[in-house]
Amino acid sequence: KSSAASDVYKRQTLYSIVNNLKFFVTPDSTDETNLKKFVNTLSADQVQRLSWLPKDIDSNDDQLVRPLVLNAALYAENPSAKSEAHEIFTQNQDKLLSLSSDIRALVLQNEVKNYNSSQLFESLLEDYRKTSDSSYKQDILFALTSTKDADQIQQIVSYFEDADTIKPQDLRTWYFRTLSNNLGEQAAWDWIRNEWQWLEDRVGGDMEFTSYITVTARALHTESRLVEFKKFFEPKLNTPGLTREIIMDTKVIESRVAMIERERDHVNAAISNILD
C-alpha cells in the first residue's frame, strides 16, 4: 500500500515539475513543441490505460492519478485525449453538472481550448451566472479563462467589474487565471494597472487586497514584466499594508526571472536530447 501511495506521490511530483517547465519555453516556439512532445511521452501510456471515465476496476490511486495524467495529455495536445473529452462533452452538454467532478474541469477546458465557439462561451457563462454549485462554478471559471480567443479574453476582463457576473470574492481567481493564460496576460496585467484605484476602493483595507499583488507575482516570469511590475508598484511602496508584499513579490519575480535566464538553455537542450 505504501508503495502505491508513493507512486501517486511520484506522479504528483513529476507533473508538478513538468508544470514549472512551462516557464522555460516561449509560446509557439520549437522549445514549447518539444516540451509538449516530452509531456506526451510521459503521459500517453497512462492515458490509454486509464481513459477519461471512471471504471469499476479503478483503484484509489487510479482515481487520484487520472486528472493529473489527463491534464498533462491535454497540455501535450494528445489527439485521442482531446477527441475523447470532446465526445464526453457532446454527450453530456445538457447535464454538465452531472459529470464526474474529477474530470469535469478538464472536459470543459478541452472544449473551450479546442472546440470553441461564441455559443459555447455564452452558454458556459450563463451557467456560471446561474449555478449555485461552487465546484461547477470553479470548473467553468477555469475553462473560460483558458480560451485562445482574444475577443473572449476582452469579454472576460470586461466582466471583472461586473458584480452580477463575477462576485468580488471570486475576482482574484478570474484575474489570476486570465493573467496565467499567455493570451490573456497582457489584458489582465493592463486591467490591474489601469483599474488599481477601483480595486483599492473595492477591496482596499481587506486582507485580500495584498493577495492581488501575490498572485500577480506568481504569474509574471519575464524580464520585461519584472521591469513593468517595479515601475508600477515601487511608487506604492509607502502605502500602508503594501510595503512588505511589494518587496517580497518583487524578489519572487526577480529570482524566477534569474533562474529561467540561467537554466533555460540547459532545460530546453535536455528535453531536446531526450526526444532525439
Residue ranges and their predicted role:
Residues 1-276:
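Long, ordered, helix-rich scaffold segments
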